[in-house]
A protein has these predicted regions:
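Acidic carboxylate motifs that coordinate Ca2+ or other divalent cations, activating on Asp/Glu
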Residues: 412, 416
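Residues embedded in well-ordered regular secondary structure
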Residues: 10-13, 386-403
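Glycine-rich, aromatic-lined ligand/substrate-binding cores of catalytic
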Residues: 423-452
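Glycine-rich, charged/polar anion/phosphate-binding loops
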Residues: 249, 359-363, 419-423, 429-434
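Acidic, divalent-cation-chelating loop motifs in proteins
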Residues: 406-410
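Aromatic-residue-lined binding/catalytic grooves and analogous aromatic/hydrophobic interfacial grooves
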Residues: 234, 384, 434
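Extracellular/periplasmic, surface-exposed regions of secreted and cell-surface proteins
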Residues: 1-37, 48-375, 438
Length: 452
């Protein structure tokens, strides 16, 4: 395995506060492997004179070679200038990230254990190379981005920034390749106002901030928009005959970016000459055009293609408290954080989706958290046959005293798939963490707690 990383950059000052910078980086990875699998003869017992028959079907040698190239180029125009109490900053740039991966493997079966050459499984004579295969793999992606940012601050009191990205991904068709993703943020250091002089002098610092932006995701396979065919025979029933065919995976040409709108508002406050710091954030996210693959019954014959379907939201809040104090040679402090978040599926066109993972069924359903646990509620245990006769039981099941009693949700007298409930989800509502640190004359003590 060979790995090479190289970076080259150059920067030129145009005028005071304005500079141009270029960066080129490369990662080159080469992987070469030669392997041999050989069956080993063994004897049934210590006294046996004839070895057991050896299955030579898995005897083979293979030669694997792969090359990966990641090239990153950037051209950035930076500006930063202060005029009295005014500070202006800006950035314009274009970037490209290109990835190329090629691999091939040649494999021959029935290899000689010593020489690694092809042999006949019956006679052991060299020269039979009928059992051979070759594999080729290619993966190429490219992401080009035009980006910009403008920032302004006044007297270390008011802050504002606008930024954008205009991204084009080779994973999408040329008509749907580009996405525009802007963001804006504002800040106000309230403690710098004249009417807050008493607060600043006696209490500490106070800052309000908010932001809004749109993020994009291209989390799909390189060729998911294409209908692809596999290079193997796939036999299937056609009437009373078995015929051969070729496996395929459907593609969708109008795939485009998944988009997430984010909103945040927060407060930063400090007390007792910055010994105590408190932060609070509220966030809201709404994701649209989610890139996912719908689940269909196996009778459809193949998987559905990746698609922009569904919409969901995530919202919550977080508070953090940090306190540090030093008394002589003793320094100690703690930090505490508590957060709450909740997500739910807003739209999932066409149908619900139920999947089974490690014996647990999960469901995507509008109005509930993503991949909620889905199943039956219990109501204790059956105590007698009389209770069993008077209760709903699973269809086709045999029940006896001591078995679990399930809730008949729709009161139809039987327990079936219509009696399932949303049982919960894998996302805890509340999470917390606590850290304490103590140091004295080179001795340190710390502890960390977290939970949900």
């Amino acid at each position: 395995n060979n790995y090479l990383n190289a970076n080259v950059s150059a920067e030129m000052k145009i005028i005071d506060g304005l500079s141009l910078k270029g960066v080129v980086g490369a990662d080159v990875i080469n992987d070469t492997r030669f392997t041999r699998n050989n069956a080993v003869a063994y004897y049934a017992s210590e006294d046996a004179t004839t070895p057991r028959p050896v299955n030579l079907a898995n005897n083979k040698s293979s030669n694997w070679n792969s090359d990966a190239y990641l090239i990153n180029t950037q051209l950035l125009l930076n500006y930063n200038k202060t005029f009295g109490k005014h500070t202006v900053s800006g950035l314009l740039g274009v970037t490209n990230e290109s990835y190329t991966y090629t691999a091939n493997e040649i494999e021959k079966k029935y290899v000689d254990p010593d020489l690694g050459i092809a042999t006949d499984t019956t006679t052991g004579e060299a020269g039979n190379i009928t059992g051979k295969t070759s594999v080729d793999d290619t993966n190429r992606t490219s992401l080009t981005s035009f980006l910009g940012r403008v920032g302004y601050s006044y007297a270390d009191k008011y802050y504002g920034e606008f930024s954008f990205r205009y991204d084009g991904s080779s994973k999408f068709h040329k008509d749907y390749r580009w996405g525009f993703f802007p963001s804006v943020s504002l800040g106000w250091r309230l403690s710098e106002e004249n009417f807050m002089d008493f607060y600043k002098e006696k209490v500490g610092d106070l800052k309000l901030r908010t932001s809004f932006g749109i993020l994009g995701s291209q989390a799909i396979g390189t060729y998911d928009r294409f209908t692809t065919y596999t290079v193997y025979d796939n036999n299937y029933a056609y009437g009373n005959s078995v015929v051969s065919g070729t496996g395929f995976a459907l593609g969708l040409n109008d795939l485009t970016w998944e988009k997430t709108k984010t909103f945040n508002i927060g407060v930063d406050a400090s007390f007792f000459k910055n010994q105590l710091n408190v932060t609070f954030d509220y966030f809201y996210k709404r994701t649209t055009d989610i890139l996912m693959k719908p689940i269909v019954p196996s009778v459809f014959g193949t998987d559905m293609p990746m698609d922009n379907i569904g919409e969901m939201q995530n919202q919550g809040w977080e508070i953090g408290i940090n306190y540090n104090v030093r008394t002589g040679q003793v320094q100690h402090g703690f930090s505490f954080n508590l957060s709450d978040s909740y997500n739910k599926v807003l739209t999932y066109p066409g149908h619900e989706q139920i999947t089974k993972v490690n014996e647990l069924e999960r469901i995507i359903r509008e109005g509930v958290p993503l991949n909620s646990y889905y199943g039956y509620k219990t109501d204790g245990y059956f105590q007698s046959y009389e209770e069993i006769e008077a209760s709903a039981i699973p269809v086709g099941g045999k029940v006896q005293p001591g078995d679990v009693k399930f809730v008949d949700r729709n009161n139809d007298g039987v327990i079936d798939s219509k009696d399932r409930y949303i049982l919960g989800n894998a996302f805890p509502r509340y999470t917390f963490g606590f850290t304490y640190n103590l140091s004295w004359k080179g001795l340190d003590f710390s502890m960390f707690w977290q939970g949900v």
